[in-house]
Amino acid sequence: MTTSHQQVHVGPRDGSRYQPVIALVNTGSTYAVMPSPMLSMLGIDPYWTGMVELGPGGSEERSFAEIRLRIGDAECTVVCVFGQQDSQPVLGSHTLQAFGLQVDTATGGLVPARAFLP
């Protein structure tokens, strides 16, 4: 697992407005996680619920939605888990793959990833 931080802009699927945040890039997490109050402020409502495995162990049901993210000049719609009120924003492996990015383990920065096909 590799971690670093990245400035991103978070918005609803229609891209009508964005909130800048510094997100933890965590390749051990599957999806993006954003604090629920921030998502609500942006007008993002949960679309579905599902079970998630928690880092310290155990699992719980959480709400999910699709959000619009901007990283640099690139924009993409990704799956996001509604975090707790004080959750740190997180970019997970699914988010990085959607943007075609990976973590450069030497620098901790995000770099283009090679896509693999069967």
Model-derived regions, located:
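Pepsin/retropepsin-fold aspartyl endopeptidases
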Residues: M1-P118
